Regions:
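Short, flexible loop motifs at catalytic/binding sites
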Residues: 1-147, 152-169
């Protein structure tokens, strides 16, 4: 997207907030299944997702941070540029930073789970672009040009007897 391109060509500022337990500043991130930090939630018996238990797990001390700490964290936060070589300022702020009483972490998790459970690509795309504030990327297979080149075939230069035209592409 144009916005993502503009952000990539900026100093890429993210709002970093201090952990109420260890004090280390970090940007809020979506936890995901492969990370041991970030926005997460508990599962109940039988692996049932419990979005109402949403919390943030510190990237550094791994403490569970309840949403009630978010206001004091936000007040002590600061914008930090990841790419200081650029003069152009760019800001990234996902909805995880919404003030308490607006959009809760539980609502964000619930929306995500509904989009995944329904298998609704439109809902998931909307969630990624509005809640994570990131461009949505379809599952794309990257082609290995070396493998394609290795499979090339060498054809002779003989034109069939009755051939009148040769087309190559």
């Amino acid at each position: 997207s144009r916005i993502a391109k503009e952000f990539q060509d900026s100093d890429q500022r993210h709002y970093h907030v201090p952990c109420p337990f260890c004090g280390v500043k970090q940007k809020f991130e979506w936890g995901g299944k492969d990370l041991d930090y970030g926005l997460s939630w508990d599962k109940g018996a039988g692996g049932i997702h419990l979005p109402e238990t949403a919390f943030y797990k510190c990237k550094f001390c791994k403490e569970r941070i309840e949403e009630r700490y978010k206001t004091e964290m936000m007040l002590a936060g600061e914008w930090i540029a990841a790419n200081q070589a650029h003069r152009h300022r760019g800001y990234h702020l996902p909805s995880f930073y919404s003030p308490v009483g607006w959009l809760s972490w539980s609502q964000i998790v619930d929306e995500f789970l509904k989009a995944i459970e329904d298998g609704n690509r439109t809902l998931l795309k909307r969630w990624v672009t509005t809640r994570k504030a990131e461009p949505y990327r379809e599952g794309v297979t990257v082609v290995d040009h070396g493998k394609i080149y290795a499979r090339r075939a060498n054809y002779g230069v003989t034109v069939p007897v009755r051939g009148q035209i040769v087309v190559a592409g």
